[in-house]
From Swiss-Prot:
Organism: Yarrowia lipolytica (strain CLIB 122 / E 150) (Yeast)
Family affiliation: Belongs to the GPN-loop GTPase family.
Lineage of origin: Eukaryota, Fungi, Dikarya, Ascomycota, Saccharomycotina
Intervals of motif Gly-Pro-Asn (GPN)-loop: 70-72
Quaternary assembly: Heterodimers with GPN1 or GPN2. Binds to RNA polymerase II (RNAPII).
Name of the protein: GPN-loop GTPase 3
Length: 271
């Protein structure tokens, strides 16, 4: 039986921790067990207590103070230290066999685009710890109001999908913030990104010498055809339930569960 883990990724401020809290609330409300694993050494206080917290091993504030590093350099140091101490992570996660583990990851995409830190951790979780993983890459819905910014996020999501080499879904969070600003028909063109949206606006705002570059980027997005988004309103239980349904399918959660013995009371009632 493999264990199930959800990697929550995305830029800072898009609602990763809010999604983690909403997801664990829903999972627990339907009688399943779940825990949040914090992999952000600079994490702020959370609604739910972290079951496993990288700050128990190393924290960004301590590293910045002792090593005289900046935030990004300190973060890299923290993860290099974690990679040298993966036995600590194995020990912390060792007792959780049939629970849903939600990994709340830092917002710095450099951890998988510039250096293979997160990909290395993912491979270790899969190969040495028996995890069935799914990555959730989150962008916030207001990005659609700035098309170049949205398509920059699409490229980041595609980069994560390619470099992490793990099952993957993409989420457009904070949908309630754009309900009155974006018609449903146009929104569908963002949930299933239409490259023409970017070309039209980018070409109208940039020097003609960049038009070929804009076209090349949109063609690449279209050729890969990998990125689609699921809408999310974190305060809407039905919206969270829909996301969980996708996660269960991707991780084959039901197939990974061992049959449970009926309770004594249930057996007596049948008799």
């Amino acid at each position: 039986m493999s264990r199930v883990g959800i990697l929550v990724l995305g830029p800072a401020g898009v609602g990763k921790s809010t999604f983690c809290n909403a997801l664990i609330t829903h999972i627990q409300s339907i009688g399943r067990r779940a825990h949040i694993v914090n992999l952000d050494p600079a994490a702020e206080p959370n609604e739910y207590e972290f079951t496993v917290d990288i700050r128990d091993l190393i924290s960004l504030n301590d590293v910045m103070e002792e090593m005289e590093l900046g935030p990004n350099g300190g973060l890299m140091y923290c993860f290099e230290f974690l990679l040298q101490n993966m036995d600590w992570l194995e020990e912390e996660l060792g007792e959780f066999e049939d629970e849903y583990l939600i990994f709340d990851c830092p917002g710095q995409i450099e951890l998988y685009t510039h250096v293979p830190v997160l990909p290395t951790i993912v491979k270790h979780l899969q190969r040495h710890m028996g995890f069935s993983l799914c990555a959730c890459y989150i962008l916030e819905a207001p990005f659609v109001l700035d098309r170049p910014k949205f398509f920059s996020g699409v490229l980041s999501a595609m980069s994560a999908m390619i470099l992490l080499e793990t099952p993957h879904i993409n989420i457009l969070s904070k949908m309630d913030l754009i309900k009155d600003e974006v018609p449903k028909r146009e929104l569908k063109r963002f949930l299933n990104p239409d490259p023409l949206l970017m070309v039209d606006e980018a070409n109208s705002q940039t020097n003609p010498k960049f038009h070929q570059l804009n076209l090349a980027i949109t063609n690449m997005i279209e050729d890969f055809g990998m990125v689609q988004f699921l809408p999310l309103e974190a305060k809407n239980p039905d919206s969270v339930a829909a996301i969980l349904s996708y996660l269960d399918d991707v991780t084959q959660w039901a197939d990974n569960q061992e049959p449970k013995e009926p309770k004594v009371e249930e057996v007596e009632e049948e008799e």
